Amino acid sequence: MPTNTDSTYFKIRSYIRDIILNILGTFSKPQPGIHILNGHRILNETEPETFRSLLKELSKYVKFIRFEEAVKLITTQQQPLEPLVAFTFDDGFSECYDCFAPVIEEYGVNACFFINPNYIEGDQKYIDNFNEHIVMTHHKQPMKWNQIKELSDRGFIIGAHTMDHYMINDDNEEILRYQINTCKGIIEEKLGKPCQYFAFPYGKLTEANELSINIACETYEYVFSQSDYKHYFSFSGKVINRRHFEPFWPIQHLKYFLSTRKK
């Protein structure tokens, strides 16, 4: 989810937002429900200690579950009596392998990593353009296929995120099918197992449309957004909604976001 994090406006807005969320989160408590948290990257913090510390604190308030278990509970419309949390990460940065996966394994659960095959296979020029102009996240490197295959063999789920982190809210069906369908085929070829999960890039409901969602639903068993978190579903029940977070966020922020009563 690209953001111009270097702008003065963004920095001031983030500062004010942090203060408000820290106050609200101090008095918030995660509510019963199935919560899928979606992250992307590390920033400048010390890792994996920061992420490990966040999960240690969060585990005092919620129960961590496997990603596929969360999906099953949501799609069968279960109503748990405690807050359940599963994790996904978009874009396939190297910290998924180096940091996020090992820490999550310490809790006996997994996560789903949504990846872009052309980013994985791109030369440095492609990678730099992807980082600076597509996802606006500086100085990143993608996971390699051997690392992704290892994660899959360790029980992590690998999902599709289009070939090029493409915004799918257009009407060019040929391009949409390339970005959505071809992505699935490449992942399945590389991993030797079905790819059932798709998360559309950028995540807002306005950044997809009925045509692209229908193509995705024809191709994958499950489709995900990163929007409208208070509701389990969007696009008339076709899309499962996730809640954005980042591993360097304060625990108060997560406590506040998880305090919503989901419908």
Segments predicted by a language model, with ranges:
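C-terminal active-site subregion of NodB/CE4 polysaccharide deacetylases
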Residues: 2-87, 95, 170-263
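Active-site beta->alpha N-cap acidic-glycine motif
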Residues: 33, 38, 42-50, 67-154, ...
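Generic secondary-structure microfeatures
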Residues: 115-117, 162, 172, 191
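Histidine- and/or cysteine-centered catalytic micro-motif in compact active-site loops
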Residues: 116-118, 163-164, 203, 228
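Acidic, His/Gly-enriched loop-helix segments that form or flank divalent-metal centers
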Residues: 142, 162, 173, 177
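Histidine-centered catalytic micro-motifs
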Residues: 157-165
